[in-house]
């Protein structure tokens, strides 16, 4: 998997940062796998500066209904339709997302020529497609808001083909059954258990993408042990009280959570427009003083998971 940040500014865009939107490229060889987390104004313009086509999008996750996370959605939906894209799209978001989308399309005389499903969510598991599952956790914010935990299922270990051939198992369809952990019977009556010829499973990756939030009860469970945690760092340590009063977090709080949760990497985003490049480096230094494995997201930055 890889993350592509399309927008990293909080509240309003700046000359170098658009408002919030994050692409998750699942990099699955046989299935569509491009997900979008939040869709601030101008997201479709940001997409034009990447190698990704909106037609590859099959899921959009909205954290909450504040405009800097949402106002780019109607335009993206319409442009996707005007481009002749017919691939189905599912939108997940809090209560009100259906009314917002349907109203925007209706009063603008717009529609989609592709199947569009809108799912209003609550806390808990959203779906499990057999390859990965997504779970929503409630955030601490003035509006109903969610963070998302994406967990890949463990992958089967490699099949020891050499040992199977030595045991007299012919390559072909039987190998596929054994790869699935099944037991087969050979023509000579011997039973071969696939589990005996599989290496240990390959652990799946886990990712936590937080919505806007101050310190909250669900944060540790959402982030626990993930490979990558994406968290806002709207303001610096000195302005922590102001950040919390508006349902946001400081650099210290994001980094302390990453340390407590035992994450592999922290990526901070949703930076207040008050910070220029020098100020953003100050935010990064504050985080790294607590959790060294911290990166600062810039627009179009790409991170492998």
From Swiss-Prot:
InterPro entries associated with the record: Metallo-B-lactamas, RibonucZ/Hydroxyglut_hydro, Rnase_BN, RNase_Z/BN
Binding locations of Zn(2+) 2: 68-69, 212, 270
UniProt-annotated binding residues for Zn(2+) 1: 64, 66, 141, 212
Essential cofactor(s): Zn(2+)
Active site: 68 (proton acceptor)
Pfam families given in the database record: Lactamase_B_2 (PF12706)
Record GO terms (molecular function): 3'-tRNA processing endoribonuclease activity; exonuclease activity; zinc ion binding
EC number: 3.1.-.-
Entry note: cofactor: Binds 2 Zn(2+) ions.
EC category: hydrolase
NCBIfam families recorded: PRK00055.1-1, PRK00055.1-3, RNase_Z, true_RNase_BN
Family to which this protein belongs: Belongs to the RNase Z family. RNase BN subfamily.
Subunit structure as annotated in this protein's UniProt entry: Homodimer.
Official protein name in the record: Ribonuclease BN
Organism classification: Bacteria, Pseudomonadati, Pseudomonadota, Gammaproteobacteria, Enterobacterales
């Amino acid at each position: 998997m890889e993350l592509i940040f399309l927008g990293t500014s909080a509240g309003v865009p700046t000359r170098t940062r658009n408002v919030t939107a994050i692409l998750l490229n699942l990099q699955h060889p046989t299935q569509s796998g491009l997900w979008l987390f939040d869709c601030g104004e101008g997201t479709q313009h940001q997409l034009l500066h990447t190698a990704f086509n909106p037609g590859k999008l099959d899921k959009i996750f909205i954290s909450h209904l504040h405009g800097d996370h949402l106002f780019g959605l109607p335009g993206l939906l319409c442009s996707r339709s005007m481009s002749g894209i017919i691939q189905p799209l599912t939108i997940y978001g809090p209560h009100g997302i259906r009314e917002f989308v349907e109203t925007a399309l209706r009063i603008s005389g717009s529609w989609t020529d592709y199947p569009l499903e809108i799912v209003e969510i609550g806390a808990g598991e959203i779906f499990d497609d057999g390859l990965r599952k997504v779970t929503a956790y409630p955030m601490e914010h003035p509006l109903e808001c969610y963070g998302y935990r994406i967990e890949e299922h463990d992958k089967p270990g490699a099949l020891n083909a050499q040992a199977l051939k030595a045991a007299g198992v012919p390559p072909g369809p039987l190998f596929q059954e054994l790869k699935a952990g099944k037991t087969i019977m050979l023509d000579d009556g011997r039973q071969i258990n696939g589990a005996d010829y599989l290496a240990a499973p390959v652990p799946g990756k886990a990712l936590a993408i937080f919505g806007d939030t101050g310190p909250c009860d669900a944060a540790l469970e959402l982030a626990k042990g993930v490979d990558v945690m994406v968290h806002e760092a709207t303001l610096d340590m000195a302005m922590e009280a102001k950040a919390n009063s508006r349902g946001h977090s400081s650099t210290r709080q994001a980094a302390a959570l990453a340390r407590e949760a035992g994450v592999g990497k922290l990526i901070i985003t949703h930076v207040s427009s008050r910070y220029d490049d020098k100020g953003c480096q100050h935010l990064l230094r504050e985080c790294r003083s607590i959790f060294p494995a911290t990166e600062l997201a810039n627009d179009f930055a790409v991170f492998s998971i």
